Design a protein with these regions (language model features):
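Nucleotide-activated sugar donor-binding and catalytic core shared by glycosyltransferases
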Residues: 1-184
Length: 184
């Protein structure tokens, strides 16, 4: 890694289909942020071949077994929805949450579960703390716009994270999250 450039980490998920759907969009934004260096945090249980097709033609390091260090060292992360969104918040790094699946999977999930938010951070806080780019909104233009925004307003996100810590510190975060999901 280049120590003189601020780091932005991509966490494209742990499932092969997530990696294949999300990572190709994420890596395209590198060209819009030449003052930053980018890295992919390789998921546990995955290896280089799981990422090779998605990064073909791009020069981006994939680093395994260092996810928390990468998140801590980053000025921002772009995270596929899941537990990594909460982990990124707990480590204090501003993030954008993204998610892409097949149209049919998304359509079925949307009909079964009517949630206001998909990221654990936003669900627990019951407001948008981190921007969510879902399905067609997970594209180069919106990712670039959102990343520029959080690089500027990272203090607001970090302040909201402090409120999140307070909620989690009180205990019962699992029950609170379940209750909020059931209310939706």
């Amino acid at each position: 890694l280049l120590s003189d450039k601020p780091l932005i980490t991509f966490l494209p998920g742990s499932r092969k289909q997530e990696i294949n759907k999300v990572l190709p969009e994420l890596i395209k934004i590198q060209k819009n942020f030449s003052k930053y260096q980018f890295v992919v945090a390789g998921a546990p249980g995955r290896d280089m071949k799981d990422y090779s097709e998605s990064i073909k033609g791009y020069s981006i390091p994939i680093i395994f077994d260092e996810t928390y260090n990468l998140i801590r060292s980053s000025v921002a992360c772009i995270v596929t929805s899941g537990t990594a969104t909460l982990e990124t918040a707990l480590l204090g790094t501003p993030q954008i949450v993204c998610y892409k699946s097949s149209f049919l999977s998304y359509f079925i999930a949307k009909k079964i579960v009517d949630l206001k938010y998909i990221s654990l951070v936003n669900i627990i806080m019951n407001k948008e703390v981190v921007e969510e780019l879902i399905q067609k909104d997970c594209n180069v233009k919106k990712l670039t716009h959102s990343l520029n925004k959080i690089l500027i307003k990272s203090d607001q996100i970090k302040n909201d994270y402090k409120k999140l810590y307070q909620i989690l510190d009180k205990g019962g975060a699992s029950k609170l999250t379940c209750d909020l999901i059931m209310q939706s």
